[in-house]
């Protein structure tokens, strides 16, 4: 079913481009926006534009942060273990681990994984930035890299690639323990399972 209004269809199309949003959900979102006062629509539009204009990637870990808070609060936070870096695929994975309140080290966000079928190679994700952080002249001594990528074929491929790059540097490489279903995304795993996976990490 398509509406007679081109403006409504354009709004539905825009919502449907969001990850995990099908056309049925997109229609509901569009109808919800239309039923709200104009002020609410303006607030939504303003929030979207502000996020695009003001949010940047942390110059250290590549997680998202406000432009005026770079480096991010995790990289600069007191009490964080500077010797351990947990490598994740996306910012939502950082949020998942932070919700557990168990892990106290630092992070590095790749913003993707190696996927030859999609034309994504090592140079297309933040591997170079990770290796730069591991150089002695960068300051603090990193003793452990925790690979916490999603348990997919692409995630495993990326983990193997990283382990081979990092091992010659004399830094211990570990990966979170099994127990997370193959193909699952970390952002949807409950806090208890993630905590156990981090606590039970093993040498890669």
Swiss-Prot record:
Q: Which GO terms describe its biological process?
A: DNA recombination; DNA repair
Keywords associated with the record: DNA damage, DNA recombination, DNA repair, Metal-binding, Zinc, Zinc-finger
Entry's SMART domains? TOPRIM
Q: Name one Pfam family in it.
A: Toprim_4
Q: List the C4-type ZnF regions, as residue ranges.
A: 58-75
Could you tell me which residue ranges the Toprim domain spans? 83-181
Which terms in the Gene Ontology molecular function aspect does this entry carry?
DNA binding; zinc ion binding
Q: Which SUPFAM superfamilies match?
A: Recombination protein RecR
For this protein, the record's NCBIfam families field holds: recR
| Task of the protein | May play a role in DNA repair. It seems to be involved in an RecBC-independent recombinational process of DNA repair. It may act with RecF and RecO.
Q: Which family does it belong to?
A: Belongs to the RecR family.
- What is the name listed in the Swiss-Prot or TrEMBL entry for this protein? Recombination protein RecR
